[in-house]
């Protein structure tokens, strides 16, 4: 059994998974909202690197009220378009992740940035949402 925590849309890592006849257990966050090391992720795609860098710096400096206000401002300019762009970026990342994962027996538990509804649209006989379930594992044949 292979355990992965926080995929964060790291496709190059997922492509290195060994093909074994046992489950891959993923503990949350299949998508990358913001990578606090370099600013990559959905927020950068939608709001631009400059805004994401500001958000990262405000977080590092514990200036949470200013950070909250910046988020509000970013969402206030054309909210319908922003929400559509966010949704499209989220769906794109899940599509890329699950394109790789469908080759494996996967048990996933959604993380705090994950969209359970979208994730569940990718479930199949080999890809399962096991959040809140008790799983007893025996070798797959």
Predicted regions and their residues:
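Active-site-proximal beta-strand elements of phosphoester/diester hydrolases
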Residues: 1-8, 141
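Core catalytic region of metal-dependent phosphoesterases/phosphodiesterases
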Residues: 9-140
